[in-house]
Amino acid sequence: MISNKRKEIDTINEHHEKNNDDSDGIDNGLLTYKKFKKDFESGSTNYRELQIIAKSLGLASNGKKQLVYNRIEGYFLSKKVKNNLTNNETNRQVEKKKEQQQPQPQEKQYILTFKDVEPVEIYFWKIFRNIVIFKHIFSNFKSKQYSYYDLIGCDEILLNGKSNSMEIIIDNIKSYNHQIIRNESNIIDIINKFKKNDEKTRSFYNLLFSRYSSTSTSPSTQLPSTIQFDGNIDIWIQRMIENVNYTALDQFIKFFKIDSEVIKKAIKIHIDPSFFGNTTYDKLKIYNYLKSINSIPTSHTLLSTISINFSTLLSFDNKFKKLIKSYKRLIESTNLQEQQEQLEKQGIIKIHPNKKYYEKLNQKILELNEIQTSQFTNYQLNSTIKKLLNHTTPTSTSTSTSTSTSTYTSTSTSTSTSLKTTNLTIISTESNYSSTNNNNNNINLKEIIKKYYKSIYLFIYFTINSANKTIFRKPLLYYLYFKKERVDKMYEHVIKKWNGSNFDHKLFFQRIFKDIKIEKNEKFELISNVLNNKYVKTFKLKDLHIFFEAVFSSNDIELIDYFLKILKQQQLNQTPETTTFPVIGSLISDYCHFIDKKEILDFYFQNYRDECLLFNDQNQTWKRIQLGLIEHYEYLTGSIGNRCNFDIFRWFDSSKFLDRLNRTIAKPLLYYFDFRGTINFNFNFIFKGLIDSNTEDSKENSIIHFLSNAQLKHPLYVSPILESSFNRYKSKMLTFIKFLFNNISKESIETKLKVINLKTDNKNFEEINSEIVLTTTLTTTTTTTTTTTTGTTATATNLLSAKKGEDVGFFIIGQTESFNFTVSIRILLVCLYRLDRVDDIIYLFDKLPEVLFNPDYFSIFTKEHCLYGISSSYYLELFINYFIENLNNNTINYLYNCLCIASKKGYTQIFKNIISSDHNSKYLLKIRTKSNQSSLFSSKLLNDIVVKSINSLNFELSNLLIDFIDFSEKDKNTLKMKIIKSK
């Protein structure tokens, strides 16, 4: 065997000599990489043969077998890469000669030859290379118009409002556009946002550190000198720790190769010792990391300051794997076992006040050390603890659920439900289910979860002062899940141990009635005891609401039925000494918003129709029924000939108003409109509030649906409606704006603006005097806007009943061909801008300067949400140039306002372009004096422009303006000092 290998090796060497050692040995007769790898994996190549091959290739032959193999494999792969590069170049030259020799075809077909290209990418390149299609598609992108990146910078709105915010920042950094990150505050927001520990985030931070450091290769004219990570190492360590960002801290330390002593010093100076003591899951991760690189000062030892936030670290809503990690991080971070051993050696443990906790904890740690995470299935690790302990996926208990005793062990129980049962044992396969617990290899999962919780609680009891033990009371859920007592006994413990607070009452009843699997008879007994005043000394009247809510929200028909029957019996036997309970009809109506399935509605309809208000004629209760059940509710109510009452002034949940209003319009035979006593003036105010609440949920189609099927008697005042949508935190309402201005031309707007009343004697001119009425014409497409109300989609046309034309006060039911709306000039221009109709704006500027640049209107256009305030740098510069070209006593104010906005937003390039123009810079950015009357602005006005850039922390722009504008030395020094104080 070895002799054969030698022959193959000799052949390799000869081949290498002939080919300048550039071959990878793939040809016939050679020891090829493929054959070499196959022989090794099959076990036919022994250690001695590997050494011979390595020596023949000039490689080291010492070390373990796998190490020698890796060297040889690396040799083959490096040869292959080199040959591929050489061969590719040779092949390209050969192909080029062939192409020159052959006649060129008239039309060349491009074919992708890569084998690993995704199918979608192939389509992309086909489109990319088709000039006609490419231009059509990319003409829809309005990056110059919006340019939200330079408009808002890297603040919390960008970070939290855009799912691709990291990619946006990366693109801007790579293109050396540092407008996206203007100051250290932006970077702190980034550190607070991007914490995921994956390759993408790690690469992002490495890019960030490389560009914002003293060694950066970024052009000096672009890099903001105020941001350099390596200039304040200790401060950035502090910020990353306090923002609990493990990924940023880890990459920061590695990138700048920070010594552990430097980290210790930074922590000692800038981090309070109690910071890590107030333990959270992520803080433990950072603490253990710093401990692993020997960077925790002795003053910050965790054990001496530790306290635990039970509500987050040990929540039963956490995944099982998080509980395991929390336990390990807590035990590892404190060196608990080492400290225990030291105490034991010193004999201190014998007199330790918490000795009993130490012994129990030590036993639990030994038991948990025997358990490996690999023993659990992925399903178990990624399930919540509550879900695993409840045996079933949290859901409402159905009427067919068996009332046999529920089990807390892994023994499978037979129920008549089809609910998904989780595996409660550790098993050797990946199955999520188990039907037996007799196998010795199976371990009860509930007991393991309990051990983890128990160990953490014992750890706390062992490490804290005995006087503070009452602070670390085990949470109520731990008691409910792990104590094997009857429900009535559990409730007594709630009263005694947890003082029976409202929160504990609510938690107890919700878990007992809805989540925890307990024998149904015990739940019945608890209901009976509460209603029979067994707990009268502890159960207060204010707790009744909590109790009723828990019963009705369970959506368990058996439970609700039993509750209502006992309550009815109590009311029949009621005496002055007993608790007075609400009548059944009121209770059902008050808690009907908890109904989440049709069966509950049917139950009330069949058994309590006459007692409750739910199905009465012209009732208001229907508004509380969940939208997903409203169609079934309508069917039940209509089946007995009753109608629902729609009273706009008694509506309490405006976020659901439009969906319900559209239903009433669609089914006027089932709903009765009660708009009596209202006046038309109030409708705009009411409708604005309803629109505001619906824009947050992006329900613009609901708004359009209503306006398409209700003939308004008076123009709709849209300015305040759209005003609220211009807030950066809200939806832009582009769909609604397109709907309004769909068929309104610039000529029709011009006509309306011409007749506007420009005369006013009011010095404090109000915007209400600058409004116009426009008419929207609805097309067939518009009037059939789809809306989703009950889970099924239908068009507005199909939803309408045959009964149309009903006058309901504010409007007349029925499809409308057009409607009028009132809009202010300021909002009009903003809407045109949003619709990318800037050419129309310029058209109106040219046609109606006396209207749009009227001095009385100037205050309107200094607001934040005006045309110039929302413009991107591209369009703001366009407006600035327009005012320069059309300069007069009116436009000069608008020009100055735009320059102030550009300064505040840090649009540095606008000012660079002005400076580069000798003509513009002389009268825009030079001080107007007696000797220089060609300049437009005084020293104070130009000073204010600079101050706005300083206040916005745009120091690059500030320095640019200070250096160029001819301020006095005193004014320059004052401005520079202001920059220093702002840093």
From Swiss-Prot:
GO terms for molecular function: DNA binding. Signal peptide: none annotated. Residues 42-76 form the SAP domain. Residues 1-26, 391-413 are annotated as: Disordered. Keywords: DNA-binding. Residues 1-21 have a biased composition (Basic and acidic residues). Residues 392-413 have a biased composition (Low complexity). Coiled coil: none annotated. Belongs to the UPF0746 family. PANTHER family: UPF0746 PROTEIN DDB_G0280785-RELATED. This is UPF0746 protein DDB_G0280809.
